[in-house]
């Protein structure tokens, strides 16, 4: 069953025995006789040797640096804390709490634990050994600290006797249980196990709650570790090669420097936190309330973590991870592929040489990268971000929409799951939109754009740009200022955003192609496409499929190859032309001209406008309907029907028929003109649908009188001076007429009357 984690206040209450020294400063001594001893230790008394006194003095110094009272060495056997050896009434070592009796505050050591005891040596204890830790432990008792559990001597076990999770020497030197019980590993690079060399986290917190803090301890700018200025060998890692310490510091801009170590480190500058060095874990801690500002790692792959104030973290060489925490931090990655995260606050991040990864979470963060300093990446959750010079890549790690701008380098920009806008700038960039409806603009350079899922928009300004889209990944649009562009596979729409003329080509999907204000050519290819010409004289070709084409302003040309194609033109929007291969076609509203470009024959119908209808090489039937139309038959045996209005009829080669269906198709208000009547080609003028005598029942045929004048008989048809006229009511005046150019005479055989 897992043990509970106690709060700091609860642990302090557990460690505080309630017995304290009072009256200001404290004294300690090394008595040379046992006259003051009232208990069983007296019989086996002996004074400490010089090595023991040095160890005791060192350990006293550790405690002295923590609390407001100052320790003074005295020769008196009435000192507050007295150190002595005994071989009686003792196991390994023990001490008495503060009090009024002569024995109160005394620390007793068993000299039988000497050189043969290895790390348990109490006769010549070395810093880092169990024996030295025992000195620190017993002084804690002499100052009023209790064990963290209900045990005293014997052989208690962590599982059975520890009351809370933090009961180990990792947290308090007053514990009986080694640091590995709570996950620390104090086996160092030399393969040996080391022990606490100072009071630990909760020792410091408790002793300062009793006696107050020493506000003069290392109150300047202090460096701990290598290049130490702490003034104590235990904090100088050129002397203390295998540190197991807790750092207390009162003031100043302080540094934890592990630069001299050959082994990777983990540094955490948070008060109450642990750091790893010399192949150990959780062997360096920082006291609660102590603020260390700066950290220096090793040449290996380190992890450095700041705290809530302004930190300077230096990773040196190696692939380091630097995390600033709160405050306005400065992070130096050094050589290697480093990860730099300033945390909250306006931070300055310098990755150095190598492929570095920056996490930017504050708009005030500044990244400084040198030229040729590797391929570097920024990841950010900010809503908008612009890459600094010499930083190549940008990845959005937030949850909302994102606007990202590249730099002059070759960038890789990655969006997130929402609607992002990525702008590559200069360089040959790769833009990855991810999910969402993204806008990707590679800028100048040869770019690769991949929108991912969603309805994406690509801005293409280089003919070498590449767009990658998967099938069924949304409805996507290309915006381009190039003079010509063809949609890649799986992209639906194309919009021209330039200022000149444009040639745009679709693909096999359902495309929407939009031109600009100049003379554009849009080709839809397969699919049911929509084409918008915009301003200018445009050519719109929907290709296969049922297409919709909107020419806009200008004289537009439409290519129609499907009977279901729809052409939409506005009023007074230019003179527009249909090119079609269909066998039958009728002009829609506001479209003026129709040209057959197929291989067979066409039945072509105009509308109420002035149309130009042009047939092909087959036997075409062209009908102008309303308006002053021009019908051009081309090759073949064509039938031309001008309809209402003053029409111009050009049959072209072949035996053509010029058909008139109503008197008002060509009367005194709007005479039609036949431009190329050729009797040798067997052309005919078809008047068979006209009633030659309005006064008689039925449809009467005309009587051709050659070049003679009308004689007042209804139904006479005359041709003179290039004008064909008919009198249908016998009044001697022309009721119907047609101009026939370049013809001097006609015969009845050239009519269908």
Residue ranges and their predicted role:
Residues 1-299:
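Zinc-dependent metalloendopeptidases
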Residues 25-36, 159-167, 172, 177-186, ...:
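GD-rich hexapeptide-repeat beta-solenoids
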Residues 30-33, 85-88, 111-114, 260-262, ...:
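Secondary-structure transition/turn motif
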Residues 77-85, 146-171, 177, 183, ...:
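Acidic glycine/aspartate-rich repeat arrays in secreted/surface proteins
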Residues 132, 167, 200, 240, ...:
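Active-site-proximal structural scaffolding
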Residues 161-164, 244-247, 349, 449, ...:
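Short, surface-exposed beta-strand/loop micro-motifs that present aromatic residues
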Residues 257, 294-296, 303-305, 312-317, ...:
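Short beta-strand elements of solenoid repeat domains
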Residues 297, 306, 730-732:
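Residues in Ca2+-coordinating acidic/glycine-rich loops
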């Amino acid at each position: 069953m897992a043990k509970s984690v106690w709060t700091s206040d609860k642990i302090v209450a557990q460690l505080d025995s309630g017995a304290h020294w009072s009256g200001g400063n404290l004294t300690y001594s090394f008595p040379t006789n046992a006259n003051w001893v009232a208990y069983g230790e007296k019989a086996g008394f002996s004074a400490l040797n010089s090595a023991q006194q040095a160890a005791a003095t060192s350990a006293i110094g550790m405690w002295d640096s923590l609390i407001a009272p100052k320790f003074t060495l005295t020769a008196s056997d009435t000192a507050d804390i007295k150190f002595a050896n005994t071989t009686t009434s003792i196991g390994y070592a023990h001490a008495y709490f503060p009090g009024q009796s002569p024995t109160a505050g005394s620390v007793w050591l068993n000299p039988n634990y000497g050189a043969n005891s290895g790390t348990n040596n109490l006769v010549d204890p070395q810093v880092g050994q169990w024996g030295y830790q025992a000195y620190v432990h017993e002084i804690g008792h002499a100052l009023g600290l209790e064990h963290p559990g209900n045990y005293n001597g014997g052989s208690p076990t962590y599982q059975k006797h520890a009351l809370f999770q933090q009961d180990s020497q990792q947290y308090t030197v007053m514990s009986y249980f080694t640091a590995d019980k709570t996950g620390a590993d104090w086996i160092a690079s030399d393969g040996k196990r080391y022990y606490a060399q100072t009071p630990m986290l909760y020792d410091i917190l408790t002793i300062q709650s009793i006696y107050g803090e020493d506000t003069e301890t290392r109150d300047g700018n202090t460096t701990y570790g290598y290049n130490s200025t702490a003034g104590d060998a235990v904090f100088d890692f050129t002397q203390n090669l295998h540190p197991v310490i807790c750092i207390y510091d009162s003031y100043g801009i302080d540094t934890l420097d592990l630069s001299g170590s050959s082994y990777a480190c983990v540094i955490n500058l948070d008060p109450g936190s642990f750091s790893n060095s010399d192949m150990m874990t959780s062997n360096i801690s920082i006291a609660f309330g102590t603020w260390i500002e700066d950290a220096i790692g090793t040449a290996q792959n380190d992890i450095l973590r700041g705290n809530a104030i302004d930190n300077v973290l230096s990773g040196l060489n190696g692939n380091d991870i630097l995390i600033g925490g709160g405050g306005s931090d400065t992070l130096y990655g050094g050589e290697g592929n480093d990860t730099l995260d300033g945390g909250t606050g306006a931070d300055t991040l310098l990755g150095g040489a190598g492929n570095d990864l920056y996490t930017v979470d504050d708009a005030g963060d500044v990244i400084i990268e040198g030229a040729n300093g590797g391929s570097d990446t920024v990841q950010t959750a900010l809503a908008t971000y612009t890459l600094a010079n010499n930083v190549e890549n940008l990845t959005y790690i937030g949850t909302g929409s994102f606007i990202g701008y590249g730099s002059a380098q070759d960038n890789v920009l990655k969006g997130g799951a929402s609607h992002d806008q990525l702008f590559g700038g200069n360089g040959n960039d790769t833009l990855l939109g991810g999910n969402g409806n993204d806008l990707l603009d590679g800028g100048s350079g040869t770019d690769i754009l991949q929108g991912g899922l969603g309805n994406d928009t690509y801005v293409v300004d280089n003919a070498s740009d590449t767009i990658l889209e998967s099938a069924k990944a949304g409805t996507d649009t290309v915006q381009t200022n190039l003079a010509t562009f063809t949609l890649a596979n799986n992209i639906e729409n194309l919009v021209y955003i330039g200022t000149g003329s444009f040639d745009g080509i679709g693909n096999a999907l359902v495309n929407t192609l939009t031109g600009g204000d100049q003379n554009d050519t849009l080709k839809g290819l397969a699919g049911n496409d929509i084409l918008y010409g915009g301003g200018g004289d445009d050519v719109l070709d929907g290709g296969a499929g049922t297409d919709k084409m909107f020419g806009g302003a200008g004289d537009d040309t439409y290519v129609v190859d499907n009977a279901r194609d729809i052409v939409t033109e506005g009023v007074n929007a230019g003179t527009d032309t249909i090119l079609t291969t269909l066998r039958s076609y009728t002009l829609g509203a506001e479209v003026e001209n129709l040209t057959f470009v197929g291989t067979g024959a066409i039945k072509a119908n105009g509308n109420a406008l002035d149309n130009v209808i042009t047939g092909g090489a087959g036997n075409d039937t062209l009908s102008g309907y309303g308006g002053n139309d021009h019908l051009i038959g081309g090759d073949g045996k064509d039938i031309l029907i001008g309809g209402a209005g003053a029409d111009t009829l050009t049959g072209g080669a072949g035996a053509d028929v010029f058909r008139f269906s109503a008197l008002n198709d060509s009367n005194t208000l709007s005479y039609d003109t036949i431009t190329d009547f050729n009797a040798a080609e067997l052309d005919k003028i078809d008047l068979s649908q006209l009633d030659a005598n309005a006064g008689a029942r039925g449809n009467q045929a005309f009587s051709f009188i050659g070049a003679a004048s009308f004689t007042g008989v209804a139904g006479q048809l005359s041709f003179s001076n290039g004008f064909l006229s008919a009198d249908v009511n016998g009044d001697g005046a022309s009721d119907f007429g047609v101009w026939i150019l370049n013809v001097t005479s006609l015969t009845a055989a050239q009519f269908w009357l």
